[in-house]
Amino acid sequence: MTDNLQSFESISQVGKTETKKPSDPLQAEYEEGKKYLANEEYGQAAVALHNALVGFKEKNDEVGIANASNQLGHVCLARKEYENALQHYLQALAICEKSNDRMSILAVMKKIVTVRTHLKKYDEALADCLTILDHYQDNRDPQGTVTILEEMAEVYIKAGKKEKAADAYRTIASIHKNFRHDNIAAKFLEKAVQLTSES
């Protein structure tokens, strides 16, 4: 018999967890900002996250700076303050690249693509898409490849480059065909045909 039994105090209902407040006031401010953001209270989220960002900068806490900048980017994106969103995302991206955090780099870059598309900086958005695409292809990630190719097609359409968007859709169809997803492949080929007939 073992003595390594879980104490009764630590057992709770499934899905029910106690939310403990972080002991660090900066982290508490950051978490509060995230809650405001989740509740679409963007003004309060911006204040809390900005305060956390200032505090993280004073402590030279790069992880905190990256996280707060990323969340502030989300707030600005939701408020359609695209230039501010871009600045926050670029700050987060620089820190993620410095620490070589590949997953965070991809997540932030996808947001940067969205922001640059809203700003009609299509060439920059497409360059970022190609960087993301390289990562997915290097890691042999067909799902990620398809997702970013769809994003590229949308950017091409907004940029008025329908033929390139059609090429992206044909590439997506080819990937799906390789995995015997014939119905999905047919839908993307149809999108490509529609775009080329509109050109």
Residue ranges and their predicted role:
Residues 1-199:
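Intrinsically disordered, low-complexity regions
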